[in-house]
Amino acid sequence: MGIIDFFMALMQDMILSAIPAVGFAMVFNVPHRALPWCALLGALGHGSRMLMMSAGFNIEWSTFMASLLVGSIGIQWSRWYLAHPKVFTVAAVIPMFPGISAYTAMISAVKISHLGYSEPMMITLLTNFLKASSIVGALSIGLSVPGLWLYRKRPRV
């Protein structure tokens, strides 16, 4: 894959991840003036995750680092635009939720309960469940850590 193809794939990923970020921001009643910023933050988060995964990081660590970036930028923008950081960050990380692995784990659980136990199906269930849980944990920890760092009143040492 050439640099132009990679750049075009990255731009496509960022544009397509901005759309659900705006959609969920509208569901959460984010003010209209903040919708473009939610789209930009969703695109930056998903694009940075894709960039790190292309560099060789696994999806869990890439998601953690991308959510750290989203949380930090959201806190800075909340100071500039006098809004709560969750206005920008919550809708921006929703495109990074692990839909495919969670769905595969759920389908595996249904197949096990319907067809009976089989070792390959149980391995698929556990693998996808742990992957989805790790990604959701990375998202939640990555969003909360910048607030703990930046809003700390006492000295760290």
UniProtKB/Swiss-Prot annotation:
Subcellular localization, as worded in the UniProt entry: Cell inner membrane
Domain of life of the native organism: Bacteria
Cellular component terms per the entry's GO annotation: plasma membrane
Chain ranges passing through the membrane: 6-26, 55-75, 87-107, 129-149
Keywords assigned by UniProt, alphabetized: Cell inner membrane, Cell membrane, Membrane, Transmembrane, Transmembrane helix, Transport
Membrane topology: Multi-pass membrane protein
Keyword Lipid biosynthesis annotated: no
Main subcellular location of this protein, as a coarse class: membrane
GO biological process: succinate transport
Family: Belongs to the ThrE exporter (TC 2.A.79) family.
UniProt subunit comment: The transporter is composed of YjjB and YjjP.
Protein task: Involved in succinate export with YjjP. Both proteins are required for export.
The name this protein goes by in its record: Probable succinate transporter subunit YjjB
Organism expressing this protein natively: Salmonella arizonae (strain ATCC BAA-731 / CDC346-86 / RSK2980)
Record gene name: yjjB
